[in-house]
Amino acid sequence: MSDREFVTVDPVTIIIKECINLSTAMRKYSKFTSQSGVAALLGGGSEIFSNQDDYLAHTFNNLNTNKHNDPFLSGFIQLRLMLNKLKNLDNIDSLTILQPFLLIVSTSSISGYITSLALDSLQKFFTLNIINESSQNYIGAHRATVNALTHCRFEGSQQLSDDSVLLKVVFLLRSIVDSPYGDLLSNSIIYDVLQTILSLACNNRRSEVLRNAAQSTMIAVTVKIFSKLKTIEPVNVNQIYINDESYTNDVLKADTIGTNVESKEEGSQEDPIGMKVNNEEAISEDDGIEEEHIHSEKSTNGAEQLDIVQKTTRSNSRIQAYADDNYGLPVVRQYLNLLLSLIAPENELKHSYSTRIFGLELIQTALEISGDRLQLYPRLFTLISDPIFKSILFIIQNTTKLSLLQATLQLFTTLVVILGNNLQLQIELTLTRIFSILLDDGTANNSSSENKNKPSIIKELLIEQISILWTRSPSFFTSTFINFDCNLDRADVSINFLKALTKLALPESALTTTESVPPICLEGLVSLVDDMFDHMKDIDREEFGRQKNEMEILKKRDRKTEFIECTNAFNEKPKKGIPMLIEKGFIASDSDKDIAEFLFNNNNRMNKKTIGLLLCHPDKVSLLNEYIRLFDFSGLRVDEAIRILLTKFRLPGESQQIERIIEAFSSAYCENQDYDPSKISDNAEDDISTVQPDADSVFILSYSIIMLNTDLHNPQVKEHMSFEDYSGNLKGCCNHKDFPFWYLDRIYCSIRDKEIVMPEEHHGNEKWFEDAWNNLISSTTVITEIKKDTQSVMDKLTPLELLNFDRAIFKQVGPSIVSTLFNIYVVASDDHISTRMITSLDKCSYISAFFDFKDLFNDILNSIAKGTTLINSSHDDELSTLAFEYGPMPLVQIKFEDTNTEIPVSTDAVRFGRSFKGQLNTVVFFRIIRRNKDPKIFSKELWLNIVNIILTLYEDLILSPDIFPDLQKRLKLSNLPKPSPEISINKSKESKGLLSTFASYLKGDEEPTEEEIKSSKKAMECIKSSNIAASVFGNESNITADLIKTLLDSAKTEKNADNSRYFEAELLFIIELTIALFLFCKEEKELGKFILQKVFQLSHTKGLTKRTVRRMLTYKILLISLCADQTEYLSKLINDELLKKGDIFTQKFFATNQGKEFLKRLFSLTESEFYRGFLLGNENFWKFLRKVTAMKEQSESIFEYLNESIKTDSNILTNENFMWVLGLLDEISSMGAVGNHWEIEYKKLTESGHKIDKENPYKKSIELSLKSIQLTSHLLEDNNDLRKNEIFAIIQALAHQCINPCKQISEFAVVTLEQTLINKIEIPTNEMESVEELIEGGLLPLLNSSETQEDQKILISSILTIISNVYLHYLKLGKTSNETFLKILSIFNKFVEDSDIEKKLQQLILDKKSIEKGNGSSSHGSAHEQTPESNDVEIEATAPIDDNTDDDNKPKLSDVEKD
């Protein structure tokens, strides 16, 4: 199916109808209708004969050639005659169909109304797709149509009417160019379209509707053209491109379309099918397009035009102009040149502001479409990088027109975003100028002061527009730092940028700019902080810290300052600079080769004039030759090679100096060329290899090129050298022959079109701008490499590498950023701004900690701490503005009875509750502390601030002192006391009425107001949410020696009127905190010693209550147990406190859980290797135990300690402490004497016949005494090292309990003593040889004591029985003698008056005889045989022993239960 078949009416009919419409209109309105009626009839009615034979048709058609007929009308008639015979358009040339309409459009004598109708017809043809790909010559048709539209002419009438016609032209051009057929247009035609529409868009005399339509069309055409770059193959990447072209060939022509033409042109018509292409519109041959310029003679009247149309129609020829290639790179370059002409500084007076702005917008559109591909086409990229960018910089620096500046800045930022990596030099210079304007810094501009102190609105616009750089990419500053600041040849753009922002972000900068500038700059700083924070969120700090291999580029960055110093020295004096560069390692050695390589590769900071003077020095010939050899001139013309050469240095001024350089250059140039004599030819144009000059020829030619460059571009030269003059001067100079004509022509044109820039030629005078730009661009004249890698430098970095750059940036600007943020935070009145600032400061602290910038980290936190209003010094600090000034008020604690809550109201609480920033600071401050992971990062000042805040909150009753309840539980301590409020008030309701307030006033009541209570509540809620205790003490990284020492140092040592309210409570609070924290770092011995010393020192503070002293005792014993070998303090504790402060450490104290826990810890020290020996050998320790034992409540625990120690550790007893231990046991054994009271009572009750329901109230004491007696006896077991006096002491201790008032104890002691003497002592020993010694040393002292004499009847009998049994035991063993018996008889004789004792003596004698005779045992049985073994004794104290006690009620004796 044909493309035309989508319309209902066939295309032939549509065209015929349009012909009729045009014919009718022309007959009515054409000025040629003054002919006769018949002629008009015949002329308009020739269609009647269209179906007749050829003869008739020919006859009537010839009528149209009459000179009185309308030639335009005849064209339509002839077209109708042709179409009447056709069923479709397949066999007719498309151009033939369109020619009558195009002739109307391009003829100036036609009225605007007729032209409008022709445009409507053309619009219909293209809209309905009548001319399409299946049409014959459809390419020519489209090209002819566009050409006719761009040369549209008609008779003028009213402005609006004329513009409406042109509006149709614009729309039709847009529809064709935008359509797929637009790609078929040639370079010259597209360029005509651009010129035509752009001239309309820029003509302010046209109506606004037309101009707007033209502008939108230009944008659409721009998009269309530059989109084509995506399909055009780039140039050869290996080809060297020499920028030697002029940029000013293409200029915007006057708006001549339509009626705006000179009267003398009205009678002449341009080629209706657009065969003419003017020289000015020709595409440069350098673009690879050969244009054939066809000049047609202008017709002098309509008849001749008709002849041309008919001739062309009959021949159906293809005109050469339409055989050109489709448009591409050449017209793109021409278009950019055209746009450049609109914005170039030299044309600023030719074009209006609106035109220049529109030109900037179109360039921006082009960049937005294909900017990323421009570097693939050197000719296009050079336009952007040199003249266009130069114009941008010039406008930024000089204009005061806001709209123009805005458009320029938008284009600049687009260039930075898209081509930033390829335009570093230009961007550096531009940003430097922008910030010098913003900061009113004229040092960056050596010109006059006209550019200083720009209006505020200009500065606002500058900063608004460049803010897109960091808004679009938060990593902009990091990437800029990598590209510029880490480059030795570039300025510190990123750092200077950020430093400028820190100044401009301050509120006071609004005085020289506008109010909107500081927020915009601040956003830039915040974006940097946010970006760095995001970079490190997923990176482990330890992993980052383990990096050892620093990046080479950062090492270079660190040496940049040194490099600049060296280059400055070189620029001043090479003899001074080169040794410095060698010394610093920038130049490998002092060899000419190394020096040459350095100057070649690092010449951006070097003064090019200085380099030139150094190279041309007579003594530096070797250096010059080494330097020149570094260039590669192969395949280049001599002028191109010189251009490359002079990008590196400035040619000196003296002829001898120039000669040395040119001579070295000539030699090197010839060495680089691979000459082949067989290729030498004068006719091979464009083939440089056919021209092979020797060194002398190159020398002459080079010198001539330099002279030509000076002649053509020196404004003082009035008559410039012509090509004929130039070529004539070089006759016979090419190997004694002439240089080829074409070769010299290329050189001459190159120098004429593009000056060889000599850097620094205008330094310091009024041409500062040109000087700065020429210095910059001279090094980019030659493009030898096309960068296809468009990947951002940020994308190539690993996260760890990126952080290294962030660290380098933050090290430079971090303090400035933090200072700026704080300054803004201080004066900010908006809560949102305050929150944003403190959040950024929080991130800054994280970044500082991550990068280990300790000073900055501490500065941030100290400043935040001062802003909390909780530090005493903060009221005098600059941040005191964060809190309102509020007069002092007493600390009032209000208890609300209905809710059972307490609220402390104080000056600090109210101030804190009313300060939003204070609360904000507090929350952030402790959040930072909570996340800390570096135990060494906090400074002493910061710790002091932290402790001050904690103590302030504690003193104001806002912070609970019980931070370590586990420690209190472990030490059996009660909760810490809280400071006392100055006033306590109970309230039934939380609201207070007016009458109540007035009554309080009359009474002098200190009750706070509702507002103050509300503020205090806020304070408490904020402190609670800050979770201070967990933040500081819950993070082990925070628990350091510095914190502990700061806490102890903050303890007040003197009680006065100001601190009496909280003095002791705070002292305990600090000490308990210190000890709890020390548990986390108890391995630090010196710290433990310091704490112990400080606690002992504080415990001696005057005026401490007993409660405080007692609590400190617990702290001390814990500290001593944690520290190693602190016997000095342990001795002080026992001697100076436990023994001397009996009024404090009373029986009641040791009865408490705290006292019991203290004893346990004291006992545990005897198991410590550090204190065991000291305690066991310290008499005062045992004295203290005896003292505590006397308190009865603790006797059991002390016995348990002794029992456990003696039975599990045989080494506990020493010669030094044996008697102390024995005395302590005897003390415990004697405690059961109180059981005598129960025995007496029990006896009375039983004698009176009362039933006994209650138990023995002294049962525990009796049982403890029995256990102690048993333990005393145990001392003789497994202890063969006892001395005689120690054995006697044990026997005497047991014997002493035989006279215990409590019968149960005394009888048990008798049995134990007898068993001890019989079973646990072996005679003889080293110390004791006979039984007599045992009896005399152990038992006789008891018989002779006054206590024994008081109850002779019971005790003496018992003791004598023991003596008898012991004697008989040893008699059986054969260890007695007559002296032994005589000794015993003498003992009995003292008490023989007692009949019972006499009987015992008689029994003894009988038993002795029986043993001696070997008769076994006495018939009566000895007491020894009747006494059970002590190992079978069981102790039980249920009832007192009495002769009348029933056997069932008497206590049974068996083993003593071991604890």
UniProtKB/Swiss-Prot annotation:
Residue span(s) of domain SEC7: 570-714
Phosphoserine carried by residues: 46, 284
Transmembrane segments: none
Domain of life, source organism: Eukaryota
GO cellular component: cytosol; Golgi cis cisterna; Golgi membrane
Signal peptide feature range: none
GO MF term set: guanyl-nucleotide exchange factor activity
InterPro entries assigned to the protein according to its UniProt record, in alphabetical order: Mon2/Sec7/BIG1-like_HUS, Sec7_C_sf, Sec7_dom, Sec7_dom_sf
Gene3D superfamilies referenced in this protein's UniProt entry, alphabetically: 1.10.220.20, Arf Nucleotide-binding Site Opener,domain 2
Pfam families referenced in this protein's UniProt entry, alphabetically: Sec7, Sec7-like_HUS
Record key words, sorted: Cytoplasm, Golgi apparatus, Guanine-nucleotide releasing factor, Membrane, Phosphoprotein
Membrane is among the record's keywords: yes
Keyword Secreted annotated: no
Entry function: Activates the ARF proteins by exchanging bound GDP for free GTP. Plays a role in maintaining mitochondrial morphology. Stimulates DRS2 flippase activity.
Misc: Present with 7700 molecules/cell in log phase SD medium.
Protein name: ARF guanine-nucleotide exchange factor 2
